[in-house]
Amino acid sequence: MSFATEVKNELCRVPLSRHCCAVAEAYGVLLYCHTFTTREIRIVTACDAFAERLPKLFRRAFGAHFVLPVTEKAGGRHVLTITDRAAIETVFAAFGADLSRTVAHHINLGVLESDCCRASFLRGAFLAGGSVTDPSKNYHLELITAHASVSREAAALLTELGFAARSIDRGANTVLYFKKSEAIEDFLTKIGAPCAAMDIMSAKVEKSMNNSINRKVNCDTANADKVVAAAQEQIDAIRRIERDYGLDVLPEKLQSAALLRIANPEASLADLAMLSYPPVTKSCLNYRLKKLTEFHMDD
C-alpha cells in the first residue's frame, strides 16, 4: 500500500458529523474530481476507503445518490457517477450555482465560513485530486484540478490558513504543491491525518540519523584510508633504506621505529606508540617515522 493511500485511508476515518462540514468536504471533492458539469458528476478513485465514503458523504451533504458504482478491472479504479438532473441541481444549488446559466467553477467562500469547513473542503480536495510521496524518498504533496480559477482561489484560501503553496500548470490541469516537510505535516494535520504527519516526522528523523551514520562511516573510512596510505609510505621508505643501506645504518631509535612499523603494517600511529618499548608519545613516534620517510631523500 502506498503512503498516499495510507493517508487517504486515515482521512476517510474522519467522522461525517456536522452537515456543514459534509457539504464543504463534498465541495472539495467536486471541484477536484474527474467531472463536475451540469450533465454529469463523475468521481474516479483507486482508493477503496474513499469509494466507500463517497455515498455516505453525498447522502449526508445533499441527500443525493450515485448510480451503482463501477469498478474497472484494469487498475481497480472505482467510478461513481450522478446523472440524475434533479440530483445535480440539488448539488449545484448547495453552492449557490444556477444551472440555467453557464457555470464557471469558483470557490464559494460562503460555504466555507468556519475553520472546520475549510479544513473539510481541503480534505475533500485532497481525497479527489491529491497525492503525496513516500517521505522515506522525498517530500512532495500536490492538489490537481482542471479548473485554474479554483486552483487560484484554493491557493488564496491556503494562504489565509498559513500555507504557502506553489503553483504550476501540468497540461490542462493546474497543480498546487508543497515540497517542505513541515508544510506537508501541518497540512495533513489540518485536514485530519495527524498519524500520517507523524509518519513524515519519523521518516525525517530516520533520514537524519542515517545521514549522520553515513557521514561518520565515510569519515572513518577516509581516516582509515589515510592511515593505510601513511603506513604504506613509511614501509616503502623503510624497504628502500633496507635495500640501499641496511637498517643497521639507522640510529637505534629510528631502527626500533622501522622494525615496529614493518612488524605492524596496518597499525595506527596511536597503536604503534602503545606497542613501543619503552612507550613513546604519538608525536614522538610520528617524528621518527617522518625521519625515516625523509632518510632516503636526504641521503
Locate predicted features.
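Extended mid-to-C-terminal alpha-helical interaction segments
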Residues: K190-K290
